[in-house]
Amino acid sequence: MNPRLDLLQPYPFEQLRTLLAGAVPPAALRHIPLSIGEPRHAPPAFISEALVRALDHSLGSYPVALGLPQLREAIARWLERRFHLPVQAVRADDMVLPVNGTREALFSFVQAAVDAESAARGSRPLVLMPNPFYQIYEGPALLAGAEPRFLNCTESNGYLPDLDAVDAATWNRCQVLFLCTPGNPTGAVMPDAYLRRALELSARHGFVIASDECYSELYFDEASPPIGLLQAAFEAGNTTFERCAVFHSLSKRSSVPGLRSGFVAGDARFLTRYRLYRTYHGCAVPVHTQLASLPAWNDEAHVVENRRLYREKFVRVTPVVADALQQDIAIPAGGFYLWPRVADDQAFTRGLFARQHVTVLPGRYLARETESGNPGLGRIRISLVASVDDCDEAARRIAEFARQPRH
């Protein structure tokens, strides 16, 4: 077996199961799970209908790694509309690659991007990432022979990795920089100046920027959608998106996490090599999935409604949780998480489950210990993915639990 498998840490939800083992919540209280970021809004009917229609004529042939040309075209035009790029700025034939959701793509991308042989030349490659982070950034880095390097995201730095705190020697060893905007779990959005700084560092030191933008369509202010890496690159004069790759998904945007559909877009030179890797990796997106994805990228009305529902939940839940935990909690710029402070994230999570049958996630499970500490310690992640009524009820139970004496 690959000895690097021993480097992988237990996944957050495995740790959560261990933490909650043996806890017996009140049987009279229905379980409200707010731990996993799995959208539970009803999927748009037109996506389901397109999927059913596609099944009638798509199961008799293998999908190709490149993806359907009409889907690549739809994605390219969506990127241009959404991020204010000129028409044909994104070439559908070599700048867009459909994938089976961002999780699969983030993993395989690192395998293609990391030059593990550089370790034999005396310099183990680095993959830099925010901390806390989506765990799929760390695992593939370890399996590719790279060393993960964690950049703490705290309230003091606006929950954005401090790029200027990284020394030149570290940047010279960096092969991939992961960004996540809006951030998971903080919801922080990277402004144009921040992305331009990342682009400057990438040009100087030669690393690839992998920007996870799967929450880009979940934002609070309809008048201010988050900027993306390709938009920042184009406006900075990098019109071919050199050393840039963005990852988008329908899971959050369209509430279809079970469809497993997304895309990678950016640097054509790199995507050509990445496509070669995927040809052998054997992970082409099924044709029926692609055909169901096509209308999803062409429609915005259902996404606007999605945002309305999340906005309503934030407005209703945030003040209740803030009052219960006796702290100021700002509604995040994007995403669907709250990231409040608690005295002990593990004890709070277990107690809340045992007494109120509500599941949240300890913040420490989403982060790693660094010289300056674990930025998830003393935080919990609350995923506002349930219905509005369930989120209201969960907030009420959190408030009741917070008022109860601890034993």
Regions found by a protein language model. Give the residues of each.
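N-terminal small-domain helix-loop-helix segment of the aminotransferase-like
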Residues: N2-E104, S108, A144, A296-W297, ...
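PLP-dependent enzyme catalytic core of the Aspartate aminotransferase-like
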Residues: R77-R81, L85, T239-T240, A354-T359, ...
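Conserved core segment of the aminotransferase class I/II
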Residues: W78, Q231-R311, T318-V320, F401-A402
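Conserved glycine-rich beta-strand-loop-beta hairpin in the small C-terminal domain of fold type I
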Residues: Q290, L294, L309-T318, D328-V342, ...
